[in-house]
Amino acid sequence: MPQLATICYIDNGKELLMLHRNKKPNDVHEGKWIGVGGKLERGETPQECAAREILEETGLKAKPVLKGVITFPEFTPDLDWYTYVFKVTEFEGDLIDCNEGTLEWVPYDEVLSKPTWEGDHTFVEWLLEDKPFFSAKFVYDGDKLLDTQVDFYE
């Protein structure tokens, strides 16, 4: 069964806005630092979902730009996650408290030292290096990354 979702990394030119997932009980992302995002709602485009999730979780009005798509086979029981990856450099507003965790601006050189999903290191580097649009697959067994495949499109 497929689950469609977005993940968004907001970039202020020297830092990424990261979400430390430390507030939701029974959270598959508990304790990890990730971008903001969430599941697509019925009738919603990935772009609309990304903008809505950014506003709901951060209070920022943003213009997300699609940078890639990642497939996570059986990331949660019986669900393959298809995640649209966005980068944001145009945004306005003030941060709000997020009910899913703590928001923090993290300098580029500290992003990869935060506890995160192993595969996130890979695609966050692609975002920071401004790699071309990508289609990737990250295969996990629990927290362990087993396999990565990627195609870049010029």
UniProtKB/Swiss-Prot annotation:
A motif (Nudix box) lies at residues 38-59. Keywords: DNA damage, DNA repair, DNA replication, Hydrolase, Magnesium, Metal-binding, Mutator protein. Its EC number is 3.6.1.55. One of its GO terms (biological process) is DNA replication. One of its GO terms (cellular component) is cytoplasm. GO terms for molecular function: 8-oxo-7,8-dihydrodeoxyguanosine triphosphate pyrophosphatase activity; 8-oxo-7,8-dihydroguanosine triphosphate pyrophosphatase activity; metal ion binding. It catalyses: 8-oxo-dGTP + H2O = 8-oxo-dGMP + diphosphate + H(+). Residues 1-129 form the Nudix hydrolase domain. Mg(2+) binds at residues 38, 53, 56-57. InterPro entries: Mutator_MutX_prot, Nudix_hydrolase, NUDIX_hydrolase-like_dom_sf, NUDIX_hydrolase_CS, NUDIX_hydrolase_dom. CDD domains: NUDIX_MutT_Nudt1. Its cofactor is Mg(2+). Belongs to the Nudix hydrolase family. Involved in the DNA repair system to avoid A.T to G.C transversions. Degrades 8-oxo-dGTP to the monophosphate, but is also active on all of the nucleoside triphosphates. Homotrimer. This is 8-oxo-dGTP diphosphatase. It comes from Streptococcus pneumoniae serotype 4 (strain ATCC BAA-334 / TIGR4).
